[in-house]
Amino acid sequence: MTIQAHKRTLSEVSTSSVGQLKRREGYTEDYTDEGSDIDMPEYVTDSANNQQWQDTISRVVQSVVSVHFAQVAPFDCESALVSEATGFVVDAKLGIILTNRHVVGAGPFSGYAVFDNHEECDVIPIYRDPVHDFGFLKFDPSTIKYMNVQALELKPALAKVGSEIRVVGNDAGEKLSILAGFISRVDRNAPDYGELTYNDFNTEYIQAAAAASGGSSGSPVVNIDGYAVALQAGGSTEASTDFFLPLDRILRALRCIQGSQPITRGTIQTQWLLKPYDECRRMGLSPESEAKAREQFPGKIGLLVAETILREGPADKSIKEGDILISINGQMICSFIQVDAILDENVGKPITLVVQRSGIDITVECTVGDLHAITPSRYVEVCGATFNELSYQMARYYAIPVRAVFLSSATGSFCFDTKEKLGWIVDEVNNQPTPTLDTFIEVMSTIPDCSRVTVQYHHLVDQHSPHVTTVYIDRHWCNEFRIFERNDETGIWDYKNLADPIPALPLKPQTAKFIDLPISNPKLARLARMLVMVSTIGPVPLDSVDPEPRKAAGLVLDAKQGYVIVSRRIVPHDCMDVFVTIAESVLVPASVVFLHPTQNYVIVKYDPAQVQAAVETPILSTERLKRGDKVQFVGYTHNFRSVSSETTVTDISSLSIPSNMVPRYRATNLEAISIESSVGSRCHSGILADDDGTVRALWLSFLGEKQDEKDKIYLMGLDLVDIGEVVEVLKKGKIPRVNIVDSGFGSISVLQARLRGVPEEWIKRMESESENRLQFITVTRVSYTDEEQKLVSGDIILSVNDQLVKQMRDLEGIVTTTDVPAVQQVLRFKIVRKGSIMDLDIKTIEVEETSKIVIFAGCILQAPHHAVRQAMLNIPSGVYCTFRGQSSPAIQYGISSTNFITHVNEIETPDLDRFLEVVRTIPDNTYCKIRLVTFDNVPFAISLKTNYHYFPTSELSRNSDTGRWIEHLCNATPAKN
């Protein structure tokens, strides 16, 4: 059975009342008035019962609130998220709301509560239980002005089998839902929600069939008299079974808070399970002990049996799995509530337990530990990842000591696995053991920026498989090294900075030796000296490209100057670290020199002085490939092993890659090469060469659309003749600039051209001059422009500057250099539009790469990048949301990726500079009104509350002189050092 812990699925629930079910089934029951022997009709009793329930519910809803919350950072086993749940007031004077622990969360929390009359108030967490699924939020009662807030009274003793109950909450995220049911069990073990997530244990749970779903977590379970008898906690996704937490220990915690007393929580680091007597007998329970227990507890079904005892815990080597708990401190035990009561009152004190092992009573003495002490209350941010001490939650599930550094967010430098982000334990960093968080902090504070250090780690699921890898220490993009600590007085996790970044160590030249390719032809074998590996690490999802590590082979264009060409899928923009690996031996940093706007290649530059190796400059072909040409394919597989094969060019045609739903870079307007050999489908990078070693084409990976949350990759070749002008500019020591006609083009057959109005003389001219393929080029889409003369979709291109357009290459960009002033080129187009020939003067543009972003409320804002302009006919604003972070106010209040922000507090924000000016004036923890436009040009407005403590406003921009990206904080709360 699949168990649903957090109850967040949005499924509609329709539950008939029990009375209605009885009537449908023809069920009748006799009711007699006291002192009377007259049977009352069923409808009379149902009517009275329903009226009492209506009166009760009308009172209860005054106490129930909808909790809108964000767990703002990944912590322990809980990911960052935004959600809704339920809570209810348990102390109206102090302003205390009871809800679930998985709502309050173990980590940082931000949220607000909405009462039944739609009054809103901020809430802060004041307590979350280390084990049991309950926590308390606090609000200011004086902020609720239009209703009399009522507290529900907790009556745990009224939860009995057969009791009729109502679950009053926000089921499936609705404002108010009332679900009916009957309590069927009061002695089931806590549900198991699976590994690597929060689980309650060492408590009884109450079971009922109420079919509650997402949003009902934290709902009060009330009886007909309006008393809260349990707390909604979880349920099954495959049945209408719900699990309620008993209120006994919750009531004790509430009284401690009301009396300003600490909520002590004791533990001997042992998990018990309630097992029925028949199982206990099989485990060795003696007949005498069973008889005594049944006599002492006539209504109980079994005893507690030890399930897990943690190593190095108070009960280690004293209690063993399968031991049956008989008594503690002379008090016979039959329930978890008794155990909790004794442990909580004896923290730091010795206790005496009697357990039965194979029919023999064994007396054990343990010192009760502090449960709060083994519950993490701080975490560290460094290198883009977050760490905390291993929690009792995780240690208990995997039966390991509560002592380790737990990687709660495997991102940034510590992204060990792109698929598995949770469950990693860091054992060593830089060959130094890290058994505790404090030791980890000491080790990390000594490592310079840009270092590569060895890390040993393992996963909780597989304790037997240690892993060793080398990680890149990023303290420049992710320069924060700080520790957050929970403050239960304010509800905020205060942070302090731990250490400033240590500057990177100077590079030293290193030697490397190439191993030639295993090819009999020596000229082809030497191609290995012209191929290097290019890898990238990106800190932010700029231009809507996921910030994941990428790697592929690149071709050296100029060994003396250190120029390398590689697929733009590997280097989508320049806001990242780029590295070149030479001969699988030497790793050196590189910088982005040139990004082609349409042809899917990037040129990067490394410092040749840092490498002492026989890197060679290839001979690049000046003759285009044709269909049927024989070439040698040299490529690299997914595990970066070189392969080679003789192959044939099978096709050269215009490229057509589908656009992604969220616009991002894709190659357009180029002639792509296909080959016969299947080896090309296994290689994401490589080259095509002649037998004399002349390089004819690049084999590149092209980023396509997302399918099932995975990027689709296309593999094709790019003729090196197409990049000849750019290479010549680079060899002269200059930086190229490309002006393009910013439209999308495709090809159509001669038949289609004739049917769409192309005159016969142009068709004859095409037939006489075309050498490779008979086709016409047509406009498939037009980028956003405010020019009067512009191309439109469906135009057929006849000529440009009186030159016949026979293929996509005839529309290539105009290459100039950056050392001369930019001049907007104008091209004379002759086209066929709706059957008529037209002449147009079309201006070319230089595509501007993104050079500035603003991070506000957890979303990344930038000017609309080229892919957005390619996809839209109208740009509503110069402030475009390209990404939004988990648990951010942007998600909580409704800013989506691909939205444009047009106004903030009714002030127009046409660009990022104006937007920054406006948001700088917005105070922390206040609402602002934001007007937006969707990608489909649908305007809407939201209100958003700022949270600068966890989501500061910052600006990241590229310095035009140095090319370095620099961050400036705009709105943030100070550290408490």
Swiss-Prot record:
Gene3D superfamilies: 2.30.42.10, 2.40.10.120. It is found in: Nucleus. InterPro entries: PDZ, PDZ-like_dom, PDZ_sf, Peptidase_S1_PA, Peptidase_S1C. GO terms for biological process: apoptotic process; cellular response to heat; lipid metabolic process; positive regulation of apoptotic process; stress-induced homeostatically regulated protein degradation pathway. Its EC number is 3.4.21.-. Its main location: nucleus. The active site is at H102, D133, S216. Keywords: Apoptosis, Hydrolase, Nucleus, Protease, Repeat, Serine protease. Residues 64-254 are annotated as: Serine protease. Pfam families: PDZ, PDZ_1, Trypsin_2. GO terms for cellular component: nucleus. This is Pro-apoptotic serine protease NMA111. It comes from Eremothecium gossypii (strain ATCC 10895 / CBS 109.51 / FGSC 9923 / NRRL Y-1056) (Yeast).
